[in-house]
């Protein structure tokens, strides 16, 4: 990369304006999933059929659909069902093996998806549980926290309005900020009236 990954993704979307919001969300979340789980996915992508780029893309899409809030449900089984219409039977079987993989059998650096230099630094610090918790947190998709413009809106009212919309996300108060909202899922915020109005 010659730029941060989010800029690479943004540049791609500018070059491909015909992509819809759902396509953009799936592509972006798949790319970031591959980066978050690079060691694990690279090791598994060394097997299977097709090009390694396709295998990595399929693993990224599976992660985006099962963990990124973009699939029909946040489970590997539903991600496989969501992908079934675009993959070959051998790819389906390969992805099923990946979903059933016992990650505890992987080498710690691969399982925790950390670069070697960072893993070595982690190993030299005390607290196995803290290291493991941090590694797991770094593999999760980032949550979306927003600050409510209290001049224009009240957080509790806005939470009610957002959750009344239904859909595939949920808005909850942030744990620390009295003016914050944490959004679970990947809503298209730019289309909502309350977001446009500030």
Feature-to-residue mapping (PLM):
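Class I Rossmann-like S-adenosyl-L-methionine
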Residues: 1-193
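Conserved SAM-binding loop and adjacent beta-strand
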Residues: 196-198
């Amino acid at each position: 990369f010659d730029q941060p990954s989010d800029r690479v993704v943004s540049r791609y979307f500018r070059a491909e304006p015909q992509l819809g919001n759902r396509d953009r969300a799936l592509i972006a979340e798949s790319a970031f999933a591959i980066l978050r789980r690079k060691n694990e996915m690279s090791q598994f992508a060394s097997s299977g059929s097709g090009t390694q780029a396709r295998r990595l893309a399929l693993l990224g899409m599976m992660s985006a659909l099962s963990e990124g809030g973009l699939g029909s449900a946040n489970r590997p089984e539903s991600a496989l069902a969501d992908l079934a219409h675009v993959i070959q039977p051998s790819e389906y079987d390969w992805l099923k093996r990946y979903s059933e993989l016992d990650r505890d059998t992987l080498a710690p650096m691969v399982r925790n998806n950390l670069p070697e230099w960072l893993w070595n630094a982690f190993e030299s610090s005390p607290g196995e549980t803290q290291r493991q918790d941090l590694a797991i947190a770094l593999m999760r998709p980032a949550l979306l926290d927003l600050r409510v413009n209290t001049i224009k809106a009240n957080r509790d009212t806005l939470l009610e309005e957002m959750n009344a919309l239904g859909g595939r996300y949920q808005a909850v108060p942030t744990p620390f900020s009295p003016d914050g909202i944490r959004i679970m899922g990947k809503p298209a915020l730019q289309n909502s009236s309350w977001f446009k109005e500030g």
